[in-house]
Amino acid sequence: MSRVNRSGENPVWTGWDVALLALVTLGTILFCILFLTFAAQKLLFHNLSFADIGKMPLLSVIAQGIAYTAVLIYMIVLVVAVYHQNFESAVRWNWPRRWPIFIAGGALLAMALQGFAHFLPIPTDMPIDEFFNTPAEAWSLTIFGVTLAPLIEELFFRGFLYPVLARRLGVVLAIILTAAGFGLIHGPQLGRAWGPVLVIFIVGIALTVTRAVTKSVATGILVHIGYNGTLSALLFWASDGFRHLERLRT
């Protein structure tokens, strides 16, 4: 009970619920990718292999968008139907009155970490770069990055995972572990290079501290949107509105 009092967190769900949520998320993403790859091969790309279609960035973004929507429904059902709680109250949504401040904070975080990244070994070619081969791919990732991605990632890491860890392990360790998990899931798209993964880990620290201090998942989402939106805006500007994406590789 003392751990609950110190952290101020006492979610109705358990660590096992969060573990199952993680498995459901991974399974749903995999299923959507496989299903859309199969459908695309049958309907659109008869001459391409299943593996080549599955690697298409646009298909990946669409599949993840569908999967994230399904995961959001699962989250709501878990809280409302299983635990009979109001979803917004249970995850501590708590929309802030001065919400633009948090978007601006995310923008400042992005600019600061862009400067910090100049002192780190950042690979010139990473898997995420494949999402900027065509304007359609760039736009799809940009839209996803300021809508479903921050919503679902913040709900999972700061809405579901963090309070369980804080109740069990305390605030400080929960912040570190939540940020580590956040960095881990972004590792593959960054080629698992320690420089960019460290940057994402720091972002995770900032987002989790925001959640811990404000007691609001919504504030973390706003900071996340500000961060992703600023990076997308910089890429948009550097590529002349995504019309000259080759400039991003020079």
Language-model-derived ranges and their functions:
Residues 43-63, 80-149, 167, 236, ...:
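Juxtamembrane helix-loop-helix connectors linking adjacent transmembrane helices
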Residues 19-23, 62, 99-104, 139-143, ...:
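Hydrophobic alpha-helical transmembrane segments
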Residues 172-179, 192-250:
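Functionally important transmembrane alpha-helices
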Residues 20-81:
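Alpha-helical transmembrane segments in multi-pass membrane proteins
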Residues 28-37, 67-75, 109-114, 178, ...:
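Alpha-helical transmembrane segments of multipass membrane proteins
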Residues 67-72, 141-145, 199-204:
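Hydrophobic core segments of transmembrane alpha-helices in multi-pass, intramembrane catalytic enzymes
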Residues 151, 155-156, 160-161, 184, ...:
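Active-site His/Glu-centered metal-binding helix of metallohydrolases
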Residues 1-15:
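Short, Lys/Arg-rich, polar N-terminal cytosolic tail immediately upstream
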